[in-house]
């Protein structure tokens, strides 16, 4: 032991576990009268937000919820969802945010697997939740959320109440001065998120308080959030806990603008009326903004930061967003990394680049997020790092405090994911000389044709360069001669038409002949609720 190891012990005065709940507590103390939440006509200050979250935690505790229990929520982007992100972990319990697009079988699996003791359900989803509860083995307390701002002309009808009490009644039971519980350890679980489950049942990904707290700071840095940002909820809060933004805004005393449905008019109204500074979403949200009807569009004065994930947006989309007043930042991550763990951090000197050189920079995923300790491209078996040559393909791997604790009740999957002391993403990419990574494909999406590897992303990029293409997805089609060949599924922009032969010829002008799709099918491309293309659905379609 050295001199710095003696008589310098950890104690309550010099160490407290990190938790994002402290972000809200501080904002309520320092900025009690600032508006924290906007939802239709409703306005809630930070003092009210904190008090209601404490009431929720208190009410749950009085009903027996304690450390290590699971509270499931199936809620839209509403104030109740924001309160659940704070009130549930205040008891020491773990928040499970259920994807609102799931079917009853998967919901029932998640309720049983997580051993959910309480379910908070928005009445928009009461029908599927009622069906799921009939299939599930657990018998949780069911609480209905009746959104007072649910529009009368909604595209879907509000379902019946299925619970034993209503959300506001539950909150009213609680104490606004509730002495909530700090985690015993910052490694304690704060939330549970399930993977998409494209093969078999989904895996339960466990987040801890430390990672969630650090993501609060990291999001502020990566998104360039100054004081009092205004954040529009176009990203579902159930998706990786909304990339941890429910916990982020309080760091800078920002305002949450809730949005139940992503509609062009509602987004432009929020941008113009509330001075929105930041939003997140898949490329489909950008397309909705760019292609909005003239009657839905409104002018706004501020420059808006738009964080997007999934595949890098085509240059035409980026140009359209810039012209409309948005600065697009490309992020990359997985459920297992709390959402974004890589950011394409733009450099001022790149603004002087010509079109092709600039496009090459925007096509990359980027560098490690501020809260991530290390990011590497490695050989998945030998664990040797690939050279930074922009050509040698390896598996993208993560290491740091915003990597999950592991998969719930699945030690084998956790051990495999963490093999060699790194989280294995399953994504294939290259490392460029300047340290930026670029994805080339998912391991399962590489097409091997005649012994040659074809990146489906490269083929999709070529298709996106055609002015009539709105969405493109390329998968492998079994072929007796070549083993596999590229098959493209394409959605055209409204009112556009192009032939299969024209698109194949377009690709041949941009790709090696063996990389070009041999067949193109024009149809709607299936996507998840967050806008990600579901290639496994397309694979099933071709057998």
Task: Give the positions of each predicted feature.
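Structural core segment of the AMP-binding/adenylate-forming
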Residues: 62-63, 90-169, 494-496
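Conserved AMP-binding/adenylate-forming
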Residues: 272, 305-306, 313-331, 335-437, ...
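AMP-binding/adenylate-forming catalytic core of the ANL superfamily
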Residues: 102, 109, 119-121, 279, ...
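Adenylate-forming
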Residues: 76, 121-131, 147-148, 235, ...
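Conserved AMP-binding/adenylation subdomain of ANL enzymes
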Residues: 213-230, 238-278, 292-293
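Conserved AMP-binding/adenylate-forming core of the ANL superfamily
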Residues: 15, 25, 33-78, 82-86, ...
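Conserved pre-ATP/AMP-binding loop-to-beta segment of ANL
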Residues: 32, 143-144, 158-165, 172-194, ...
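Conserved structural elements of the adenylate-forming
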Residues: 50-58, 172-177, 191, 205-227, ...
């Amino acid at each position: 032991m050295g001199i710095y190891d003696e008589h310098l012990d950890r104690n309550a005065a010099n160490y407290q576990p990190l938790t994002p709940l402290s972000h809200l507590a501080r904002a309520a103390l320092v900025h009690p009268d600032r508006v924290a939440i906007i939802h239709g006509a409703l306005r809630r200050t930070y003092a009210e937000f904190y008090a209601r979250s404490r009431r929720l935690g208190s009410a749950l505790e009085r009903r027996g919820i304690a450390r290590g229990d699971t509270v499931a929520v199936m809620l839209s982007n509403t104030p109740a969802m924001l309160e659940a992100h704070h009130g549930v972990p205040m008891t020491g319990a773990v928040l499970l945010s259920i994807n609102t697009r799931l079917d009853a079988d998967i919901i029932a699996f998640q309720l049983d697997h997580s051993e959910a003791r309480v379910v908070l359900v928005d009445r928009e989803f009461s029908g599927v939740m009622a069906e799921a509860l009939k299939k599930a083995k657990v018998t949780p307390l069911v609480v209905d959320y009746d959104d007072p701002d649910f529009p009368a002309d909604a595209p879907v009808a509000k379902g019946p109440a299925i619970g034993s009490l209503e959300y506001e009644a539950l909150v009213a039971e609680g104490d606004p001065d509730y002495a909530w519980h700090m985690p015993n350890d910052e490694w304690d679980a704060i939330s549970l998120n399930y993977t998409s489950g494209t093969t078999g049942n989904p895996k339960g990904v466990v987040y801890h308080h430390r990672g969630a707290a650090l993501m609060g700071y990291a999001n502020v840095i990566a998104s360039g959030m100054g004081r009092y940002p205004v954040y529009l909820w176009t990203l579902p809060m159930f998706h990786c806990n909304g990339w941890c933004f429910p916990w982020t805004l309080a760091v800078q005393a920002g305002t949450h603008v809730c949005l139940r449905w992503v509609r062009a008019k509602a987004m432009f109204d929020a941008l113009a009326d509330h001075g929105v500074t930041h939003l997140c979403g898949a490329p489909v949200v950008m397309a909705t903004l760019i292609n909005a009807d003239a009657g839905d569009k409104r002018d706004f004065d501020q420059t808006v930061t738009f964080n997007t994930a999934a595949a890098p947006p085509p240059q035409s989309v980026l140009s359209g967003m810039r012209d409309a007043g948005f600065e697009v930042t490309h992020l990359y991550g997985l459920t297992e990394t709390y959402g974004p763990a890589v950011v394409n951090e733009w450099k001022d000197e790149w603004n002087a680049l010509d079109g092709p050189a600039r496009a090459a920079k925007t096509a990359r995923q980027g560098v490690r997020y501020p809260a991530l300790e290390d990011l590497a491209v490695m050989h998945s078996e030998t664990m040797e790092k690939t050279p930074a040559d922009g050509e040698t393909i390896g598996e993208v791997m993560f290491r740091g405090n915003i990597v999950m604790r592991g998969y719930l009740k699945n030690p084998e999957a956790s051990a495999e994911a963490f093999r060699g002391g790194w989280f294995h993403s399953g994504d294939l990419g290259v490392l460029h000389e300047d340290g930026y990574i670029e994805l080339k494909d998912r391991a399962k999406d590489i097409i091997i044709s005649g012994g040659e590897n074809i990146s489906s992303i490269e083929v999709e990029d070529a298709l996106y360069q055609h002015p009539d293409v709105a969405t493109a997805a390329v998968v492998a089609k079994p072929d007796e001669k070549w083993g596999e060949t590229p098959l493209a599924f394409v959605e055209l922009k409204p009112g556009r038409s192009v032939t299969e032969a024209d698109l194949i010829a377009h690709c041949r002008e941009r790709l090696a002949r063996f990389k070009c799709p041999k067949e193109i099918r024009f149809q709607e491309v299936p996507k998840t609720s967050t806008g990600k293309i579901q290639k496994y659905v397309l694979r099933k379609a071709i057998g």
